[in-house]
Amino acid sequence: MNEKNSLGLDKCFLELDNPILLFTEWYKEAKKTEINDPNALALGTIDEKGYPNVRMVLLKDYGEDGFVFYTNFNSNKGNSIKQNPNISMCFHWKSLLRQIRIVGTAEKVSDEEADNYYKSRSYGSRTGAWASNQSSILKDREELNQSIKKFKDLYKDENNVPRPDHWSGWRLKHHEIEFWLDGENRIHERLKYIKENNDWKKILLSP
């Protein structure tokens, strides 16, 4: 067993019936050990041609109702999710030799929730949400710089930058979560939670 692990998966299999409890414990430890961005995750989506796409985003909230990230809804990822809301996430914490995979369906967060998070962002991030037509082709960097200047001039009051309609959050409503723990000689430990009729079923998987 990985010596860095303070929660053996066999123990969790016996004692933890809710995957969010185990996620919380691992996430707390990742915040202590990861050099930066312990909330970084690989987000998997399917585009309109049926091809998978993966990119890194940041987890901004989570709970029994799902895992939340924010983005431009007109971006490639936003359009993919609108077309096919079946998505996945993967956290990989090298410092802990642990990984968590999450599968579920995306739904838009409420406007109130999006507004509250948007207000917590820096002034530059809020004006940047207006300035960047995410995933579109740029003629050159100066085109983006001019757009940033335009919206900073438009919204000079740092406390009064409205949230764009095209910028909001998605919540992954999870129905599968798998916890992976590095083991010697590639004999890893894997514990999977599967939601069935609002209850969680636990299974151990072969490495």
Language-model features, listed with the residues they occupy:
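Binding-site signature for planar aromatic cofactors or substrates
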Residues: 1-207
